Amino acid sequence: MKTLYSLRRFSHVETLFNTTLAVAGRDQETTGFAWWAGNARLINLSGKLLGAHVAHAGLIVFWAGAMNLFEVAHFGPEKPMYEQGLILLPHLATLGWGVGPGGEIIDTFPYFVSGVLHLISSAVLGFGGIYHALLGPEIIEESFPLFRYVWKDRNKMTTILGIHLILLGLGAFLLVFKALYFGGVYDTWAPGGGDVRKITNLTLSPSIIFGFLLKSPFGGDGWIVSVDDLEDIIGGHVWVGSICIVGGIWHILTKPFAWARRALVWSGEAYLSYSLGALSIFGFTACCFVWFNNTAYPSEFYGPTGPEASQAQAFTFLVRDQRLGANVGAAQGPTGLGKYLMRSPTGEVIFGGETMRFWDLRAPWLEPLRGPNGLDLNRLKKDIQPWQERRSAEYMTHAPLGSLNSVGGVATEINAVNYVSPRSWLATSHFCLGFFFFVGHLWHAGRARAAAAGFEKGIDRDFEPVLSMTPLN
């Protein structure tokens, strides 16, 4: 009688120490997993699993290169990036490539080079993935003992963790080196409306860097998302990179403590769940960063933040009505509060009207007009520069609002405003991805814990509905 499932299906998250175990093929009979279970069929085949991961990396890098070139081909220098639906070129521009004063794009060749390099890299990764999936040894340690691992081997797993941490730390230092030595990065706070500059005076004070982590996430505090100068951002990368590298070396040289051996589940599916949980946190954090932060994600490339667009509208109409003779310091609105200017609960002078809720916005085009107690009336009357007027009028009409059918802008505008902000796309996508990764974390964590406790049996293959259905062919 044909066996529809293997007993090894019942210990699917554990790898046996018996290295003589024959793993014949990649079908349901020999692995206990059907074709749609994906890489689960390769749990015990380290060579094939390596091929799957390398090929997956190739697909990711191919998308990056192809999408990069697609955006270069469609880019028009006469419009800002955020009006053109771009999500990759803004990242390259933020790193200081091809950008001039004020965020103007003066050279697209670096973007073309980036796309080509990613395509070439994806070809190398794709070849490596195909080689390891089809031609290389199924179990890699049979040919290369150095790469032998068993999911239950706690010491080997923490060594692999350490290697990953060192690589992540080196990645963080790549940004540091770019900012310090290789041309600098784009600083939206540079005088006169932003420019590329080298970062010379890093913030390395632990009280400042780790103070961000201890801040409240609410209101004007904003947790780490409140960072608003590049010295802090690059200094933070020095700290993160150093901690990752030191932590990686520590994990390579040490063995897990007894409490860690007891508290954690040591299986392939458990490691998957830990990774998904970490990625979920990354996704939610990136969502908040791209939505609220206009230093790491300059508005010149990503469009204004929601609060920024709102404050820009108040500023634009203050400029207009002041020219028409309005006394912006004394005019009252329909509620009796200041029409153009009012005081915040802490006594600062802020913009009046509905935008009062965004009174703690900080933006490069607005900060020069502040004094010690908020907005300075004398500066508003005498010091407003043309570039500030132009930028606020532009941001006012490009709020990061709108739906997927590209009817964007603010609610008072006509439907012809065909615009969805990259901030909307990036924040929404990272929130959704973060959420689904969190669900995946819970799912795989539950399965891993159940398997470790000995009562997870998976789907009963004897009574699977698909087995009683007519074959597709």
Swiss-Prot record:
It is a multi-pass membrane protein. One of its GO terms (biological process) is photosynthetic electron transport in photosystem II. One of its GO terms (cellular component) is plastid membrane. The modification N-acetylthreonine is found at T15. Gene3D superfamilies: photosystem ii from thermosynechococcus elongatus. The chain crosses the membrane at residues 69-93, 134-155, 178-200, 255-275, 291-312, 447-471. It is found in: Plastid membrane. The lineage of its organism: Eukaryota, Viridiplantae, Streptophyta, Embryophyta, Tracheophyta. One of the components of the core complex of photosystem II (PSII). It binds chlorophyll and helps catalyze the primary light-induced photochemical processes of PSII. PSII is a light-driven water:plastoquinone oxidoreductase, using light energy to abstract electrons from H(2)O, generating O(2) and a proton gradient subsequently used for ATP formation. GO terms for molecular function: chlorophyll binding; electron transporter, transferring electrons within the cyclic electron transport pathway of photosynthesis activity; metal ion binding. InterPro entries: PS_antenna-like (IPR000932), PS_II_antenna-like_sf (IPR036001), PSII_PsbC (IPR005869), PSII_PsbC_sf (IPR044900). Belongs to the PsbB/PsbC family. PsbC subfamily. Residues 1-14 form a propeptide. It holds the Pfam family PSII. [CaMn4O5] cluster binds at E367. The modification Phosphothreonine is found at T15. It comes from Cuscuta obtusiflora. This is Photosystem II CP43 reaction center protein.
